[in-house]
Amino acid sequence: KGFEIDYQTRLWYLPGALNGLVFNANYTVATSTVKYPRTVVSNYFDFDTFTFVQENNDTTYVDRLLDQPDEILNISVGYDYKGFSGRLSMLYNDNVFVNTNFWPEKRETTDSYSRFDLSVKQKLPVEGLEIFLNASNLTKTSDVTRYRGISGYNDNIKLQQYYGQTIDLGIRYAF
C-alpha cells in the first residue's frame, strides 16, 4: 500500500531573472507486510520409545517487504537561463529491510540517508557543444547496514560502505 505525489514547475511567471527558477518534488510512501517462512526445530528424548526425536514445525513470521523503503523524497531546485542549466538535488531514502533471518536479531536493515547532488551545464557558441559539471554525494553520505540485534562488537553495524564524492567535468558534443 502506498501513494506517490509528484510536483514539477518552472516559475516562468515570476518577474525578471527569477522566471528561470525550477522546482521539482517527489514523495513516495510504500508500506508492506510479507509472510516469510520459518522452521522451528524441536529436539527431545522420548522415554516411552527410548529414542531421540527431532520435529520441524513450519510456520511464518511477518515483516516488511525486502529492499523497499517506507519513504522516498526527491527535491531539486534549479535555474535555467538561455544556454545555462543548473540543479541542486536532495534524495532522502528511508531505511530498507535487506535480509531476512530465522533469528529476529539477525535480520538486517540499512540506515536511512540523505544525499545531495549538483548538476550544471552551459551551452557553448558552437552548435551541439556544451560544458558540464556533475557532482554526486556532496555530503559524502555512507551506506550502513545494521543487524536488528547487537553484534559481537557491542553495536549492531554489519557493514559500512564509503563511496565519497564523485565529480565529472567535461565537454559534450551532440550531433
Where are the language model's segments positioned?
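Gram-negative outer-membrane beta-barrel transporters
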Residues: 1-97
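Residues that define the transmembrane beta-barrel architecture of outer-membrane proteins
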Residues: 1-3, 69-73, 112-116, 163-167
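Extracellular loop and loop/strand-boundary signature of outer-membrane beta-barrel proteins
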Residues: 58-63, 102-108, 154-159
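Outer-membrane beta-barrel architecture
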Residues: 4-8, 76-78, 119-121, 134, ...
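C-terminal beta-signal and adjacent terminal beta-strands/loops
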Residues: 92-100, 121-175
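Short, local alpha-helical segments
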Residues: 99-104, 112-117
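Residue-level marker for the onset of beta-strands and adjacent loop->beta junctions
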Residues: 35, 73-74, 116, 129, ...
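Surface-exposed coil/turn segments at beta-strand junctions on protein surfaces, enriched
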Residues: 16, 68, 79, 109-111, ...
